Design a protein with these regions (language model features):
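Coupling and communication elements adjacent to P-loop NTPase active sites across diverse families
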Residues: 1-11, 89-146, 229-347
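Conserved beta-strand
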Residues: 5-8, 17-29, 57, 340-346, ...
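ABC ATPase nucleotide-binding domain signature region
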Residues: 30-31, 43-104, 364-376, 380-432, ...
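Hydrophobic anchor residue at the start of the ABC signature
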Residues: 150, 178, 466, 485
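Catalytic Walker B motif of ABC-type/P-loop ATPase nucleotide-binding domains
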Residues: 161-165, 170, 406, 478-483, ...
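Conserved catalytic segment of ABC-fold P-loop ATPases
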Residues: 200-207, 519-527
Length: 540
């Protein structure tokens, strides 16, 4: 029940190195693996699972490995039994019941006489009770497919279980069933996730940071506390190093000025004393050499202080929080920005909402969380609110002003435009200086503002999109967000939270991320389920 990676290196076919000489081990228990997007978390899981070959080094897993990737390799025509890997055993059991007692049948069955009962128990545990084993995947929701994939891995009883973002497509109920299932897993569990509720159920956190794996005992909250404390120390060290550098520079300048004054006075004294030129020259050389030695001492002190500052700055993480002021997004408390009554719509021949429709009114700077099971119609309702989809029945009224949408795909910006060009297109009346200042608030500085959108990392794309949405002309009075944290790393989630907390308009957010919803000050909870839209007191 362990994973041992020794001197592991991996490079892509174009020779771009992802990590080098990585060594670590993970034993029994639950380990959460965290890192910024692009650091190589998913690739590391694929290396451990044997799907990728390392450029150098070795991976040794003690026991059978179960692996649930982020993108599941299932086709729509597969049956539930095929995904669970039990179809051959079920066929053999059926053949035995029909009188076939061949060695091949008994070999196929092996010890799995109770495979159907165990399979159904595992499916029931993950909320898939009543799911027929011959049902095709094409008829299941994305969340059901993920839960089925996890059931398949747990059914194998692996010694090592690798999960890559297992909660991404799960609604709240399915997430909690997954949490419970993993709580009872007794092998070596390694999970890549940005789900902070799941990470808080881990025994330890492994962080892939600057090409190394660093382990932190305890759950994600304990890890965050440790990192925050270290960052506070690093910030203090930077301040001290900056002050020391200023002191050393000042002292060097003062020493140079004193030496210059002494040299000037000495020259005057030598002239007044009428000393021979050879004596006067020696005195001058001695004074210059003494000044040079003193200057070298001060220069070394300045270099040492600069080195200490560089070291202190390297210890500071680039996990900066966005700090914004968004006065133009203010919506008066009494202003109704959207009203919908008797809304009804059908998708795929199925009515999403109750026969009498649903109603929704958004007033003032409300912060609304829209929850409910997958497939209930939450994303469809957002599209009705922003006008990209018209209801089949019912009435809609939108106040004058702009409604902006932010999807989990972050596909709002033109791929060939630079960050600076994107903001200029969104806010053409802003001066160049003002745009540069705003982009700096979103952590875009120097050459980064001239990068095309297509070349941005996931976190950079989020920040660029937020800048263009929040500072667009006119500023949005209503913001719609559909599972905005799904493809973000933990740093980017924190930056999104900061931006939304600065936003002063109304927003409606669809999310199953409980910690995210807690952090953005939701003041109204709505649940869409079985065609009914109802007020609730919390995420459940």
């Amino acid at each position: 029940m362990s994973i041992v990676c020794s001197h592991l290196s991996f490079s892509w076919p174009d020779d771009v190195e992802l990590f080098a000489d990585l060594s670590f081990s993970v034993g029994a228990g639950r380990t959460g693996l965290v890192a910024p997007n692009g650091a190589g978390k998913s690739t590391l899981l694929k290396l451990i699972a044997g799907e990728y070959r390392p450029t150098a080094g070795t991976v040794v897993a003690d026991g059978a490995i179960g692996y649930l990737p982020q993108s599941l390799p299932f086709t729509a025509d597969l049956t539930v039994a095929a995904v669970l890997g039990i179809a051959p055993v079920l066929d053999a059991l059926a053949a035995l019941a029909d009188g076939d007692a061949s060695d091949e049948v008994f070999t196929t069955i092996g010890e799995d006489w109770d495979i159907e009962e165990r399979s159904r128990a595992q499916l029931d545990r993950l909320g898939l009770d009543g799911l027929a084993l011959d049902r095709r995947l094409g008829t299941l929701s994305g969340g059901e497919v993920v839960s089925l994939g996890l059931a398949a891995q747990l059914l194998k009883r692996p010694s090592v279980l690798l999960l890559d973002e297992p909660t991404n497509n799960l609604d709240s109920d399915a997430r909690h069933r997954l949490y419970d299932a993993l709580d009872s897993y007794t092998g070596c569990l390694l999970v890549v996730s940005h789900d902070r509720v799941l990470l808080d159920r881990m025994d330890q956190i492994a962080e892939l940071y600057r090409g190394e794996i660093v382990f932190y005992g305890g759950n994600f909250t304990a890890y965050q506390d440790t990192v925050d404390a270290a960052q506070a120390v690093a910030e203090g060290n930077i301040r001290n190093a900056e002050q020391q550098l200023k002191r050393e520079k000042r002292q060097m300048q003062e020493a140079r000025e004193r030496a210059a004054r002494r040299s000037s006075n000495a020259a005057r004294n030598v002239k007044d004393a009428g000393l021979p030129k050879i004596v006067a020259g020696k005195l001058k050389r001695d004074a210059q050499e003494s000044a040079a030695r003193a200057d070298d001492v001060h220069a070394k002190r300045v270099d040492d202080a600069r080195t200490r500052l560089d070291e202190a700055e390297r210890a500071l993480r680039d996990d900066r929080v966005i700090a914004l002021d968004l006065p133009d997004t203010v919506v008066p408390a009494g202003r109704t920005v959207f009203t919908g009554e008797g809304l009804q719509i059908s998708r795929g021949g199925r009515k999403l909402f109750a026969d009498n429709g649903i109603g929704l009114s958004i007033r003032g700077p409300e912060r609304i969380a829209l929850t409910g099971p997958n497939g209930a119609g939450k994303s469809t309702l957002l599209r009705i609110i922003d006008g990209t989809l018209e209801p089949d029945a019912g009435t809609v009224q939108r106040a004058d002003g702009r409604i902006a949408s932010l999807s989990q795909r972050l596909d709002l910006l033109a791929e060939d435009r630079t960050v600076a060009e994107s903001l200029a297109a969104a806010a053409p009346s802003l001066s160049h200086t003002r745009r540069m200042h705003l982009l700096a608030q979103f952590l875009f500085r120097g050459d980064r503002i001239h990068l095309p959108v297509a070349a941005l990392s996931g976190g950079e794309r989020l920040r660029a999109t937020l800048a263009c949405v929040l500072y667009a002309e006119p500023a949005p009075q209503l913001l719609l967000l559909d599972e905005p944290t799904n493809n973000l790393d933990l740093v980017s989630v924190g930056q999104l939270e900061s931006a939304l907390n600065a936003y002063q308009g109304a927003f409606v957010v669809v999310s199953h991320d409980e910690r995210f919803l807690d952090a953005i000050g939701i003041d109204r909870w709505l649940r869409l389920d079985n065609g009914e839209l109802s007020a609730t007191s919390a995420a459940g």
